Amino acid sequence: MEPGGSENAAALWISEGGRGPGRGPGPEWTSRSLLPQSGPALQPTPYSQRKGPRETHPDALKGGGGWGWGNTQSLSGECRKGVGAGEEKDGAAVSLSTPHLLAASAGLQPAPSPLGTAVCPFSPHSSPSFSHHRTLSLFISPAPLSCPAPRAQVHRSTPMGRALLTRVLLEPLRPWACPRLPRSPPGGAQSGRGGALAQPTLRCAAAPLRAWAWRSSDPPPAFSVFCHPPRGFDIS
C-alpha cells in the first residue's frame, strides 16, 4: 500500500478528472469507504491495474445457480475514471458484473428468478457520502409459490377389517346378553276355573307378549253399578 493511504484504500473509487462543473479533482468517496483519506490522492493498488470489466465465467451468466443473484463479483480494488453528467468512459470498472442485473437496473424491471424470488432494484439514488455517482439498492421479495400444500391422509379410528373381526368374535356372546327364562308348561298354567295362576310366568324382554282372549267357557266378569240420584230429585 502507498504511504499516506488508509486501510480501506481497496474500497475507494478514484476519480481523475471530468467530474462536472463546480467539482475539482481528488478522491471520490462512496458509501463503501469507511475511513477518510489523509494526504495525497491514492494510487490504484498493483492488483487493480487492469482496465475494462473483469472476465466473467460462462456459468455466471446463467444466474448463479438459480437464486437470481448471478455471479456478483466484488470489484472493490479497481479504480473508476472520472465521468461527466450521465456518461461513462470506455474501460471503466463496473461494480455490477452480471449482465442480467445491468439490464434490470437500466429498465428498472424485476429480474426473473426460477425459485420465485424477484430481484427488484429501486430507483437510483445518491449515496449518503460525498459521491454523486448513483448506486442501486436491491430488494429481494419472496413471491408466493404455486405448489399446492401437501394433503394429510385421514385415518379412521376403527378400520373396516377390525370392525368386522370384532363383530364376528362377539356373535357367539349374544345369547348371554339377553338370557331367556323357561316358560310355564301349557297344562299347568291354570289350576281351575277362575284363571288362578299356579306359578307366575316369567318372560324375557325380547319375547313377545300374548294378548289375553276371553273364552266363552269362562264366566263373564261381574260388574256392579251403583247409581246415586242427585240430591233433591226423587225417583218414584
Swiss-Prot record:
It comes from the Eukaryota. Residues 1-73 are annotated as: Disordered. This is Putative uncharacterized protein RUSC1-AS1. It comes from Homo sapiens.
